[in-house]
Amino acid sequence: IDTVTVGKQPSGMSINRAGNLALIANRADNSISVLSIQGKQVKLVDTVAMGEHVAHVAFTPDGKRALAGKFPGHKVALLEVDGSKVTYAKRDLAVGLWPYNLDVTPDGRLALTADNGNNGGSDGNVDTVSVIDLEANPPRVIDKVVVGDAPEGFAISPTGRLAVAVLLRGSNNSKTEWFYNRNGSVVVLKIDGKKVTKVGEVEVRGLPEGAVFSPDGRWLYVGNFMDEDISVLRVDGDTVTNTGTLVKLPGKPASMRGRTQ
């Protein structure tokens, strides 16, 4: 119904829980676009300079803060939100290498980042998920959890009990590379208070990038870019299993959107 012009190479987007403000991370522009939402009207109201490439952005549940992943800087920027005014006071947190995706728990206590590693691609070496304590003053990184090679897609369940990091595992690399795998995988992380622990790993298909939970948290859907389909996984407590069901798509799924922040 309309087109809104933002910055160059828009890479990540987040809409606040109230549904009246959206932020877009513009990778090639080193900026974040601020959009107001009123009914079906969406307008660009501001652009915030970030100084470096930003790959993704996420609101906290109360809408008073947002976090932006500074992809090549290996940092997460903290932004303050007051109405439609978004301010960046150059407060950054050092996380793992090449943070690409990030999410905030539904209770707003933690933020987790998928640290993609190796300039945003597989190299056979393990990478991490960084754990940020948002209740601390000031917020800080309290842990880094080793997950595997090249976590890109990332999601936290609606209950806040689980998170998943989607590993590329060299599935988009040449078959001659020593770290090549035909399929990627999903690493399951248990969230217990402020402790995050790897509890499982499930193989999916080629170059998995996006992941979303169903609203009730009982299902997980993973988009497989190379195979042009979606893997359907069942969630039972802390256990995630691949049902083997595939939903064929007419194109390559590069990202997916799930629960409201």
Residue map of PLM features:
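Predominantly soluble domains enriched in secretory-pathway, periplasmic, or organellar proteins
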Residues: 1-261
